[in-house]
From Swiss-Prot:
Family, as annotated: Belongs to the methylthioribose kinase family.
Organism: Bacillus subtilis (strain 168)
Pfam families recorded: APH
Catalytic activity, reaction form: 5-(methylsulfanyl)-D-ribose + ATP = 5-(methylsulfanyl)-alpha-D-ribose 1-phosphate + ADP + H(+)
Role noted for this protein: Catalyzes the phosphorylation of methylthioribose into methylthioribose-1-phosphate.
Positions of ATP binding: 44, 61, 115-117, 250-252
Single Gene Ontology MF annotation: S-methyl-5-thioribose kinase activity
Binding, substrate: 233, 340
Keywords in alphabetical order: Amino-acid biosynthesis, ATP-binding, Kinase, Methionine biosynthesis, Nucleotide-binding, Stress response, Transferase
Quaternary structure (record): Homodimer.
InterPro entries the record matches: Aminoglycoside_PTrfase, Kinase-like_dom_sf, Methylthioribose_kinase
Protein name in the entry: Methylthioribose kinase
């Protein structure tokens, strides 16, 4: 299978990215512009264009028609750039302070021109370095509560929502999640990647039919529950942050899926960072886990009471039941994320940079055990505190 490009598609380089910015009139005329390709992800080129005289900058992001991490042997649709720019614009309608502003997009060139966020740091990098970002979980809880509610059936007329489901159909990137999060880590698949010292624990997982059945249920929900427009890849590497500011980026995996998925992915990545820390240094992560759920629950509930179009919205117990369902699935999805980030294709630096090696293996084993417990016991948790306490118990705190 070869790489497919649209007739007008042309891969940008630093000079052509500058030419595009000039053509679009995004800088004052006769500005002297510098450009640097700064992308460190698997799927895109990212150009930082800077006008030193006026101290202005922007980002030009272009999707490439293959996964950079693999090469042209893994072709990917460039339509994901349309998905990303459309998702950012829609998210910006509800939380403009939490996403980058989009200035321009071109579907055929798979280009999105957006606000420069280089004054911020990728949250995963900062957390690994020991930063705690006091407002991170409150901001992400608000992002989740508003974006997930206002794109759902609770807030939209059915015909409008169905048009959005169509607009954000994203089969190729969903396929990546379906395989790398919900399938391959639970079987002896060649995409898996783990240290040989983990093999006994990995094979224990592969031989656990009970957890496989529960993972299958979660996968089915991901496949079939078109509840709302989700980000689809909301980990700490998809967030820029500082002590006071938070911006969610990279929603190219966006589609209509289960509300709990984004919630669970973010929570899992907080726990992954906690595993990279020791003792009291984990406490800020536990506080973030608690805060993100509480803020999401509060924000979602306020939006429900204020703006729900569902005729059943005011029936006593309906909101409570809805939140309980979201919570249960979120913890299950978090378990899948913990496992796949430990033994799947795409690891996280939180675990892979732990030293010495024996300590790293021990923490990865704990990630597998915690992920398995979250999947199997998700219906038993009543509060987010229950989840945190189980995590503490498993990591021997």
């Amino acid at each position: 299978m070869g790489v497919t490009k649209t007739p007008l598609y042309e891969t940008l380089n630093e000079s052509s990215a500058v030419a595009l910015a000039v053509k679009l009139g995004l800088f004052p005329s006769k500005s002297t512009l510098t450009c640097q390709e700064i992308g460190d992800g698997n799927l895109n080129y990212v150009f930082h264009i800077y006008d030193q005289e006026h101290d202005r900058a922007l980002i030009i992001k272009q999707a490439v028609p293959y996964a950079k991490v693999v090469g042209e042997s893994w072709p990917l649709t460039i339509d994901r750039a349309r998905i990303e720019s459309s998702a950012l614009i829609r998210q910006g309608e509800h939380v403009p302070h939490l996403v980058p502003r989009v200035f321009y997009s071109d579907t055929e060139m798979a280009v999105t021109v957006m606000e420069d966020l280089s004054h911020l740091k990728i949250a995963r990098k900062g957390l690994i370095e020991g930063e705690n970002y006091p407002h991170l979980s409150q901001h992400i809880g608000e992002f989740l509560g508003k974006t997930l509610f206002y794109s759902s059936d609770y807030a939209l007329e059915p015909k409008v929502k169905k048009q959005l489901v169509k607009q954000f159909t994203n089969p190729e990137l969903c396929d990546i999640t379906e395989r790398l999060v919900f399938t391959d880590p639970f079987f002896d698949h060649d995409t898996n990647d783990f240290e040989e010292e983990l093999r006994p624990f990995v094979e224990k997982l592969w031989n656990n039919d009970s957890v496989k059945i529960e993972a299958a249920k979660l996968k089915k929900s991901f496949l079939t529950s078109a509840e709302t427009l989700i980000h689809g890849d909301l980990h700490t590497g998809s967030i820029f942050a500082s002590e006071h500011e938070t911006k969610v980026i990279d929603p190219e995996f966006a589609f209509y899926g289960p509300i709990g998925f984004d919630v669970g992915q973010f929570i899992a990545n907080l726990f992954l960072n906690a595993l990279s820390r020791d003792g009291a240094d984990r406490e800020p992560l536990y506080e973030h886990v608690n805060q993100v759920w509480e803020t999401f629950e509060e924000t979602f509930s306020e939006a429900w009471q204020k703006d729900s179009l569902d005729v059943y919205a005011n029936i006593d117990g309906y909101l409570t039941d809805t939140l309980s369902h979201i919570f249960e699935e979120a913890i299950g999805f978090a378990g899948c994320e913990l496992i796949r980030r430990t033994i799947g294709l795409a690891h996280v630096a939180d675990l892979d940079t732990i030293v010495p090696f024996d300590k790293r293996i021990g923490r990865k084993r704990l990630a597998l055990e915690t992920g398995t417990a979250f999947i199997e016991k998700r219906s038993e948790f009543k509060t987010i505190t229950d989840v945190i306490e189980l995590f503490k118990l498993l990591v021997k705190e």
